[in-house]
Amino acid sequence: MLRWTTAGESHGRALVAMVEGMVAGVHVTTQDISAQLARRRLGYGRGARMKFEQDQVTMLTGLRHGVTLGGPIAIEIGNTEWPKWETVMAPDPVDPAVLADSAARNAPLTRPRPGHADYAGMLKYGFDDARPVLERASARETAARVAAGTVARAFLQQALGVEIVSHVISIGASKPYDGPPPQAADLTAIDASPVRAFDAASEALMIDEIEAAKRDGDTLGGVVEVVAHGLPVGLGSFTSGDNRLDSQLAGAVMGIQAIKGVEIGDGFETARRRGSVAHDEIYPGADGVMRSTNRAGGLEGGMTNGLPVRVRAAMKPISTVPRALATVDMATGEEAVAIHQRSDVCAVPAAAVVVETMVALVLARAVLEKFGGDSLAETRANIDSYLRAVATREPSTDGARASG
């Protein structure tokens, strides 16, 4: 079973990603991970931190000469600001006199931000300061997820030729993009867009939204879409809820900071249609069955159906609002304004890259559960055997459609 976890705090020495259960023989390098982390820093409306956040990657274990060994993989992402925080965030006790020299950074944060983990985290864990909460709850943690996901992406591409691409559907109240989903070849152009939009008209509307929010001292959320091309029929299962691939994808994506909604395929729009126009009709074709639509987003009954998997995620506006929202000072019980940590106006373009990451990890796990293997070569052999078996069971005809 493929497993992953992360460790570390936003202003700690480093973040660490752990990946366990990856087969041997997958080619992945420090440069590959750095390239994906650079994509995570993209986006119009990002804050000052992106200017000096360098994401210093160190491969600690699990690889030799750029190839996975089959054991646990550990990846460290160093914090370039650590010297400024070394005293305040030190793991070991610090002399109070020394700590006093960092009084500004060490001041208790007692005014929780609405929409953030501050309030519930302070009460749940017994903290009188939000610092221990926000350090781990921060979206900075997603850098470690991207590192782990890079390994999963490499496996998917090398085992099956799977390509994963994302784009931003809308930001704030901008008109949502409603054209065809992007192909893998479109990724370079999407990354070149300041908001990672797939078309120029949508890009202009999104930038206008961000500029207006910036002028008003506000923040924005939005909707992103991830598309995975090249998956075979049959990943996941209908046998129980937790085996359904769409439930696994939804759970993983909802676990990303600030994500408040997930849909597969046309999702909520499907609920507004009649059944006669909500599903993807099946027709005979020369190379097997074919579809003229992909409203289900490549998943039916919890299993991939051979079409691209489409996952959308809704990101709420960042909860650190420059003009500060009303709150209560937890130390005094009095009305106050929320603390303001350095933040972005909009991080939706970066969130799309993180959603790619979680989709890649879940899909890689599903592939390994289905096909197994200790090495990439063994997994490929199992995949090839399965695909041949599926091909013999799939109907094929040169006849014309009877309907549609």
Curated annotation (Swiss-Prot):
Binding site for FMN: R136, A137, S138, Q257, A258, G301, K316, P317, I318, S319, T320, R342
Gene Ontology annotations of biological process type: amino acid biosynthetic process; aromatic amino acid family biosynthetic process; chorismate biosynthetic process
Listed EC numbers: 4.2.3.5
The protein's annotated pathway: Metabolic intermediate biosynthesis; chorismate biosynthesis; chorismate from D-erythrose 4-phosphate and phosphoenolpyruvate: step 7/7
Molecular functions per Gene Ontology: chorismate synthase activity; FMN binding
Subunit structure: Homotetramer.
NCBIfam families reported for this sequence: aroC, PRK05382.1
Name of the featured protein: Chorismate synthase
Chain's gene name: aroC
